[in-house]
């Protein structure tokens, strides 16, 4: 499709939502999962990059192939689909499913197109993980029924890699555009890429541009701490420092890619005029007069971490993560 798919990604609590909302505020952009740029983070599209998601399935099928591994990742994929079927967001004060009925209708068709061979089995790795009920069932039925008849685990072999990629692109296109009213607009997707593998993780998106966002580690830790983040080490500054050094060291050299742009959160706020011009040039889209996006609230919150961090926490981060600090001097605000 000729319209852009702009995908934002960050390593966690780094402000990807700001750039997402900035684009969503334009009249030439739309999101399948969010109607208004309200700083709400419920609308992240992680189906492709989550463990158990589409990328995990692809890597298990083709990058780490074995008959058992194909069965394992396919089983995990189906478990993941069950989990996200329960995922809800709040829109206009009403709960709605993030992934629509159309998504699950299309996923059934998609699975048929990517599997070449299928039967049931009970390989050792799966047998070792059976619960008590299934172990007892197998012990009883094994006397008069084969593992294939018992249907414990679906063993699958995929179609060729090229076909898988093509069918995945068609599927992602279809489900994204099925959830938007106006199909003649660019689409913006939050957290739809793996920050550390931006291009490899987005091979299933057509006509895409990827925006990676980094943020000052003081603000990241403060956000983790105040939110009591479930997935991040906001409880201990020393663990956070080790964590941050580790994840930053894994960033690959993607700066020269024509499809990937790196944005520094604080710089995008303070020097918004120039930074937004760079973004628009990267996306090859024009500035529009009707864009009412207000950067002032974000500008006021740049140093919010000062009120959250203790002097010790701030000193440790500023000392050990000095080269990653991004706050501008306060007089420049």
Where would I find each of the regions flagged by the language model?
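A generic structural motif
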Residues: 27-30, 186, 205-208
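A short acidic/basic microdomain associated with nuclease active sites
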Residues: 187-191
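Compositionally biased, flexible interaction segments
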Residues: 148-174, 323, 327-330
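PAPS-dependent sulfotransferase catalytic domain
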Residues: 2-8, 162-182, 192-287
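A polyampholytic, Gly/Pro-enriched intrinsically disordered region
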Residues: 51-62, 232-242, 307-316
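PAPS-dependent sulfotransferase catalytic core
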Residues: 1-163, 298-300
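PAPS-dependent sulfotransferases, especially Golgi type II membrane carbohydrate sulfotransferases
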Residues: 1-6, 25, 104, 110, ...
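Short low-complexity, flexible loop/linker segments enriched in glycine and/or proline
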Residues: 45-48, 226-227, 304
